[in-house]
């Protein structure tokens, strides 16, 4: 999104954002999204052991997954295993080999995003992998990497200085009771300690993103406001704050101990928008930044095509989803035999891809009519007539007064985009849970 577009998006919420969409309508939207995710994010994939070569003129983004953690958080549904150094070092070697296979196919990338798990379980291997990626793919302009508060001030972490442009740190909350309930207090320390580590990390990376979650049990309006005020005082370059996601995998623990069953997500989201207003620009429905032209966690907004490497990663290339093996053993065997880690694929219809792009456009705060015309040969008002009618009827989008091609998301639209993306990610988490279910001890 251009600077001018982001400035106009911010104008939509600048004067005390107010979400007027009735709660029953938002509940209905969530039920509708759950229907569509169940329909489209299901395991009806076809066996596959290769990915296609890149298309001329297309932009690509590279994602790499590191599936190891020293401890496993109860609310996390990402693909991860308990850390073992021998397994992790062998994994990084395989990851670098898979990168070389992508290079041999002709790929280059504009951005690299490394997620997990905990990407920094072996900082020396991570640094070596990033250096290898930069050498293989000279088009990479920005490297983003996830981490947790534990590693921020370790001596070995300095190996990432100059290699990582954007560091995203999962904090979730500064409230002591919430951190204790989520088992993070014992792992990462008191909120004041985490705050000081973040303050020091700001000087070591061009972009520091702090990742927060709202919707926890016990997270009253006062607690959430205190979190937001601490964030603005800390002043990281970027903030990502999204609702707690309850999936099939986490439903029992999250509903019983973690999730706020009485949450009014509209009031929480209004508070977040209005607290960060004036300090940050809106990047997506749940991402905020000091600058308008930087990458952020939801890379799918800016890239139609991305390639995922590593066990448990997903690729979306040319309207087809590719799924890498969730078994570390099978992943290693495939790489050792000269094949990439992909095991299955699923092609999506033109209409399904249009709906997906519509979701991302709303989540990103803007919709380009010419984008749909160029990519699908039709206007969104024709190809997605029901969806567009609903957005206008609920006051979720409005015409950009400076650009007849663009529609802007209002606070109602940002609320819709947030809930739609929340349910989309929850659907992806359910897919991960199904793919992990058959794994046994020999798959580690």
Give residue ranges: language-model regions.
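Short, amphipathic alpha-helical interaction segments positioned at domain boundaries
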Residues: 412-444
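Short amphipathic alpha-helical interaction segments
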Residues: 378-392
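N-terminal pre-triad scaffold of radical SAM enzymes
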Residues: 43-79, 96, 106-113, 119-120, ...
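Short Gly/Ser/Thr- and Asp/Glu-enriched loop/turn motifs at secondary-structure junctions
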Residues: 107-109, 209, 401-404
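A short, conserved structural fragment
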Residues: 392-402
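C-terminal scaffold of the Radical SAM
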Residues: 83-102, 111-378, 439-444
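Minor-groove-contacting beta-hairpin "wing" of winged helix-turn-helix DNA-binding domains
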Residues: 404-410
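Flexible, acidic/Gly-rich N-terminal and inter-domain linker regions that tether
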Residues: 1-61, 398-400, 437, 442
């Amino acid at each position: 999104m251009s600077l001018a577009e982001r400035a106009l998006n911010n104008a939509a919420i600048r004067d005390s954002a107010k979400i007027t969409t009735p709660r029953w309508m938002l509940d209905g939207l969530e039920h509708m999204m759950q229907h569509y995710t169940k329909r489209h994010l299901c395991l009806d994939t076809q066996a596959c052991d290769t990915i296609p070569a890149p298309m001329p003129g297309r932009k690509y983004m590279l994602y790499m997954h590191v599936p190891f953690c020293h401890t496993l958080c109860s609310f996390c549904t990402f693909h991860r295993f308990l850390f073992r150094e021998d397994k992790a070092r062998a994994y990084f070697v395989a990851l670098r080999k898979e990168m070389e296979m992508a290079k041999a196919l002709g790929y280059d990338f504009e951005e690299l995003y490394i997620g997990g798990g905990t990407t920094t379980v072996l900082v020396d291997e991570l640094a070596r992998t990033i250096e290898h990626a930069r050498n293989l793919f000279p088009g990479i302009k920005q490297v983003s990497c996830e981490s947790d508060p534990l590693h921020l001030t370790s001596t070995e972490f300095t190996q990432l200085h100059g290699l990582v442009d954007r560091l995203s740190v999962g904090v979730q909350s500064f409230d002591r009771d919430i951190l204790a309930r989520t088992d993070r207090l014992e792992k990462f320390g008191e909120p004041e300690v985490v705050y000081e580590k973040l303050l020091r990390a700001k000087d070591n990376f061009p972009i520091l993103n702090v990742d927060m979650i709202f919707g926890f049990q016990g997270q009253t309006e006062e607690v959430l406001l205190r979190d937001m005020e601490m964030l603005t005082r800390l002043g990281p370059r970027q903030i990502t704050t999204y609702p707690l996601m309850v999936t099939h995998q986490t439903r029992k623990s999250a509903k019983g101990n973690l999730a706020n069953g009485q949450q009014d997500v509209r009031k929480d989201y209004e508070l977040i928008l209005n607290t960060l207003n004036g300090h940050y620009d809106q990047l997506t429905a749940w991402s905020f930044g000091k600058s308008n032209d930087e990458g952020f966690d939801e890379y799918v907004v800016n890239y139609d095509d991305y390639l995922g490497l590593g066990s448990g990663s997903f690729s979306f290339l040319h309207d087809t989803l590719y799924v890498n093996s969730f078994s570390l053993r099978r992943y290693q065997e495939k790489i050792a035999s000269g094949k990439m880690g992909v095991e299955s694929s699923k092609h999506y219809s033109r209409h399904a891809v249009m709906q997906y792009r519509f979701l991302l456009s709303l989540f990103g705060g803007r919709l380009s009519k010419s984008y749909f015309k160029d990519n699908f040969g039709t206007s969104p008002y024709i190809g997605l007539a029901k969806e567009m009618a609903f957005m206008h009827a609920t006051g979720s989008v409005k015409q950009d007064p400076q650009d007849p091609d663009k529609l802007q998301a209002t606070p109602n639209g940002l609320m819709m985009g947030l809930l739609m993306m929340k349910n989309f990610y929850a659907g992806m988490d359910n897919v991960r849970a199904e793919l992990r279910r058959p794994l046994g001890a020999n798959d580690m």
